[in-house]
Curated annotation (Swiss-Prot):
Keyword set, alphabetical order: Ribonucleoprotein, Ribosomal protein, RNA-binding, rRNA-binding
Sequence similarity: Belongs to the bacterial ribosomal protein bL9 family.
Record protein name field: Large ribosomal subunit protein bL9
GO molecular function: rRNA binding; structural constituent of ribosome
GO cellular component, one term: ribonucleoprotein complex
InterPro entries linked: Ribosomal_bL9, Ribosomal_bL9/RNase_H1_N, Ribosomal_bL9_bac/chp, Ribosomal_bL9_C, Ribosomal_bL9_C_sf, Ribosomal_bL9_N, Ribosomal_bL9_N_sf
Length: 151
């Protein structure tokens, strides 16, 4: 099935890209969520408009992403106190991307979307220092050290 993306889809493309996907993936995932439209002549014109708008936004987006990167990497330490931790350093719950976003904001950093946070695994389940990657733009990624402590 030939589709034109209307939003960025990881491992597939950016808005305006014409992609060939399996029918089930297109019908059951991309189309219902509004991430793509069926490729027709009119849709191709619409994709060109989307691509032009994306190019204008990307310059502004790249500059903004670099500013956010400097703000995030300028934070001296981001500490997250977790109430439920065993003496061995293992958490009874887990630290999610939303918890990391709240910790960054509390430390004086910018307000981020939880989908931009790249955890080492799906969740953090131990205390100590963990390296976090924040994907701000396809070309800009900020690195951050999160210290999880029992509180």
């Amino acid at each position: 099935m030939k589709l034109i993306l209307t939003a960025e889809v990881e491992h597939l493309g950016v808005p305006g890209d014409a992609v060939e996907v399996k029918d089930g993936y297109g019908r059951n995932y991309l189309l219902p969520r509004g991430l793509a439209i069926v490729a027709t002549r009119g849709a191709q014109r619409q994709a060109d408009d989307i691509r032009r708008a994306q190019e204008l936004k990307s310059v502004k987006g790249l500059e903004h992403a670099n500013e956010l990167k400097q703000a995030i990497e300028g934070l001296e330490s981001v500490e997250l106190a977790v109430k439920t931790a065993a003496d061995s350093g293992k958490l009874f719950g887990s630290v999610t991307a939303a918890d990391v976003v709240a910790a960054i904001k509390k430390a004086g950093g910018p307000n981020l979307d939880k989908r931009t946070i790249g955890l080492p695994k799906a969740h953090i389940k131990t205390t100590g220092a963990h390296d976090i990657a924040v994907r701000l733009h396809p070309e800009v990624t900020a690195a951050l050290s999160l210290n999880v402590v029992a509180g």
